[in-house]
Amino acid sequence: IHVYERLRDLYVAEKSREVKKSGTDEAASVCELSDQEEETLAVCGLLHDACKINFYVPGTRNVKNEKTGQWEKVPCYTIDDQLPYGHGEKSVYIVSGFMRLSREEAMAIRWHMGAWQDGEKQNAGAAFGMYKLAVLTHLADMQATYLDENES
């Protein structure tokens, strides 16, 4: 939910900035988003990590007990990748099985990791240049990860 909240905030801020820059007097209505905008933000903010569904499964691993020196089984999560596909691409593929995504939504979900996932800096940059929503979704994901959910 943090990514959705961050994405909505970023989108409203960017929309406000664009209105202010254009010099039109729409400031009062700028924070009102259309139903289509609200749906797009929900789709991207909530479904960008659909690829993680059933990806992590409960398991155990052995850890040496510091006090006794004995090995003990402790619960953990392991990876069970039933669909070895890229992170962003896999989410687009999964979501597309249930609903039609606009090109902008597909690009935002695909590139929400930026070029971190597979090192495709050139393609990520091209997508960010063409689809503002892709940039905002990536930023929202980073904010949620490092500002809202950081446990360190």
Locate each region found by the language model.
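Divalent metal-dependent catalytic cores for phosphoryl transfer on phosphate-bearing substrates
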Residues: V12-N150
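Glycine-rich active-site/cofactor-binding loop and its immediate structural neighborhood
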Residues: H2-L7, Y11
